[in-house]
C-alpha cells in the first residue's frame, strides 16, 4: 500500500489579515485608499503579497478585516481573489468594521478585529490561526513557521527579522534566549534595545503571529473584558504571553522564499513615500532584490484584460523607448524616453517627454515636453505640457509633496491647485 504524504499544517490553518490601516506616512497616496490597497510593482496591490504567501503556502481559508476607506481594497479582492470555492472547503471572507458586535464600536485595535469575528473564525473549523499584516512586501512560506510553532509547543510564535537598531522604533522589539524563546517584548520603543553581541541591530516583529485557535480564542475573550486594555496584539496580548506563557521567535531567514536572483531575505514596510518609491524602483535593477518572475511562488492579483504595451516613433529626440524599466499592459510610450522607471497599467507618455526614476500609478498621462525625475505620480494624474519636476527642490516643494529623501509625490489635486494659482 502506497504511503500517504504527511498532512500539511497549513491545511488546518487560516490566515486572518489585518488590512484596516491608513498608512498616514504615505501622505496623499492613502487619501482615497487604505495602505494595503496601495499599488505596487506594476500590477499588484500591497495586500497581494500576504494573500499570495498564504495561497502558495497551502492555506485555503482566509479572512480580511478592513476599516479605513476600504472600497478600493474590497473591490480589488472581489475581482482578483474570487477563485475560492466552498465546495472545496475554501473560503475568503471580507470583514468590514460593520459594528456587528456593538453598534457603537468599530474595531478598537488589532486584537479586537479578531474578537469581533470569533463566530466567523469558529465556522472555519481550524486548529491554527496566522495573524498577518496586510501592508508589507515579502515572500514567505508560512508552513515552515507553523511547523516550528507546533514543534516548540509555543502559545504564540512571532515572525521576526533583524533591522538596524535606530530603525526599530516603528516595530515591536524583542529579546530572545538561545532557544529563541522571547524574554521581553517592547512595542515601538523610543530607544530600542540591541541584540546581545550585535548592538547595532535589533530583533523586530514582522507583525506575523501564529496561535492555536483555542488558546487565542480564550485570550481574546478575556482581553475584551479588560477595561484597561487597548485590545491590540503588540501592546497588550503579546507582552502578556511573554510574561505569563511561552512566546517563541521565528526568524524570517528560515522561511523566506528566495530564488537564485535574490541574495538576501527581502522584506519591506513601504510605509513612507521614500520607501515606497525605492522599493518600486529597485524592481528595475538588472538583478532586482525582489524576484517577481518566480513562477513557483507567484504573486496573485487582479489582472485586467488589456492590450500589450506599445512603443511608437523612432526619430532623433522623438523615440519611444524604455530602458531598465517596467512597463505594464495598455501603456503607450509615444516618442518619449523612459529610464529606470515603473509604469502601471494604462499610462500614456507623449512626444519629447522624459521620465527618469519615476513610479507612475495606473492611467497617468504625461504630456509633451514634460521632464520628470525622482517622483511618484498618483493614479489618473495628467501632467501638463512642459512641466519640469525633480530639478528645482524649492519649486517642487511649493506645489507638490517633497519627501525628506527628495522624492516628489504628485496628485491631481496638487496639479489643479497649481493651475488655479498660475491662472
UniProtKB/Swiss-Prot annotation:
Q: Which UniProt keywords apply?
A: ATP-binding, Carbohydrate metabolism, Glycogen biosynthesis, Glycogen metabolism, Nucleotide-binding, Nucleotidyltransferase, Transferase
Q: Which pathway, metabolic or otherwise, does it act in? A: Glycan biosynthesis; glycogen biosynthesis
Among Pfam families, the record links this protein to: Hexapep_GlmU, NTP_transferase
Q: What class of enzyme is it?
A: transferase
The answer to whether the entry has keyword Cytoplasm is no
- The EC code for this enzyme is 2.7.7.27
Q: Taxonomically, which superkingdom?
A: Bacteria
Q: Which residues bind alpha-D-glucose 1-phosphate?
A: 107, 172, 187-188, 205
What biological processes does GO assign it? glycogen biosynthetic process
Q: Main role? A: Involved in the biosynthesis of ADP-glucose, a building block required for the elongation reactions to produce glycogen. Catalyzes the reaction between ATP and alpha-D-glucose 1-phosphate (G1P) to produce pyrophosphate and ADP-Glc.
Q: Name the family.
A: Belongs to the bacterial/plant glucose-1-phosphate adenylyltransferase family.
The entry's protein name is Glucose-1-phosphate adenylyltransferase
Amino acid at each position: 500500500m502506497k504511503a500517504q504524504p504527511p498532512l500539511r499544517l497549513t491545511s488546518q490553518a487560516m490566515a486572518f489579515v489585518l488590512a484596516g490601516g491608513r498608512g498616514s506616512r504615505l501622505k496623499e497616496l492613502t487619501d482615497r485608499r487604505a495602505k494595503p490597497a496601495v499599488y505596487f510593482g506594476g500590477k499588484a496591490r500591497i495586500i497581494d503579497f500576504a494573500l499570495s504567501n498564504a495561497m502558495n503556502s497551502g492555506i485555503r481559508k482566509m479572512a480580511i478585516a478592513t476599516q479605513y476607506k476600504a472600497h478600493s481594497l474590497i473591490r480589488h479582492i472581489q475581482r482578483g481573489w474570487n477563485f475560492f470555492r466552498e465546495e472545496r472547503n475554501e473560503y475568503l471572507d471580507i470583514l468590514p468594521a460593520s459594528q456587528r458586535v456593538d453598534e457603537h464600536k468599530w474595531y478598537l485595535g488589532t486584537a479586537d478585529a479578531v474578537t469581533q469575528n470569533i463566530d466567523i473564525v469558529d465556522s472555519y473549523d481550524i486548529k491554527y490561526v496566522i495573524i498577518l499584516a496586510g501592508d508589507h512586501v515579502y515572500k514567505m512560506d508560512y508552513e515552515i513557521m507553523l511547523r516550528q510553532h507546533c514543534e516548540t509547543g509555543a502559545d504564540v510564535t512571532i515572525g521576526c527579522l533583524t533591522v538596524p537598531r535606530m530603525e526599530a522604533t516603528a516595530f515591536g522589539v524583542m529579546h530572545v534566549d538561545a532557544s529563541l524563546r522571547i524574554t521581553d517584548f517592547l512595542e515601538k520603543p523610543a530607544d530600542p534595545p540591541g541584540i546581545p553581541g550585535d548592538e547595532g541591530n535589533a530583533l523586530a516583529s514582522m507583525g506575523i503571529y501564529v496561535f492555536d485557535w483555542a488558546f487565542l480564542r480564550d485570550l481574546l475573550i478575556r482581553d475584551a473584558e479588560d477595561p484597561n486594555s487597548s485590545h491590540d496584539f503588540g501592546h497588550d496580548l503579546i507582552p502578556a504571553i511573554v510574561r505569563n506563557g511561552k512566546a517563541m521567535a521565528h526568524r524570517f531567514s528560515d522561511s523566506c522564499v528566495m530564488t537564485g536572483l535574490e541574495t538576501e531575505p527581502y522584506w519591506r514596510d513601504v510605509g513612507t513615500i521614500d520607501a515606497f518609491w525605492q522599493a518600486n524602483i529597485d524592481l528595475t535593477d538588472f538583478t532586482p532584490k525582489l524576484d517577481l518572475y518566480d513562477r513557483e511562488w507567484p504573486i496573485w492579483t487582479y489582472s485586467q484584460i488589456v492590450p500589450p504595451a506599445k512603443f511608437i516613433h523612432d526619430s532623433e529626440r522623438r523615440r519611444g523607448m524604455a530602458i531598465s524599466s517596467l512597463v505594464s499592459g495598455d501603456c503607450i510610450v509615444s516618442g518619449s524616453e523612459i529610464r529606470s522607471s515603473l509604469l502601471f497599467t494604462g499610462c500614456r507618455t507623449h512626444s519629447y517627454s522624459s521620465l527618469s526614476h519615476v513610479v507612475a500609478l495606473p492611467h497617468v498621462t504625461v504630456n509633451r515636453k514634460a521632464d520628470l525625475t525622482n517622483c511618484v505620480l498618483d493614479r489618473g494624474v495628467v501632467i501638463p505640457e512642459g512641466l519640469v519636476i525633480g530639478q528645482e527642490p524649492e519649486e517642487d516643494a511649493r506645489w507638490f509633496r517633497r519627501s525628506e529623501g527628495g522624492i516628489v509625490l504628485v496628485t491631481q489635486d496638487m496639479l489643479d491647485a497649481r493651475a488655479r494659482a498660475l491662472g
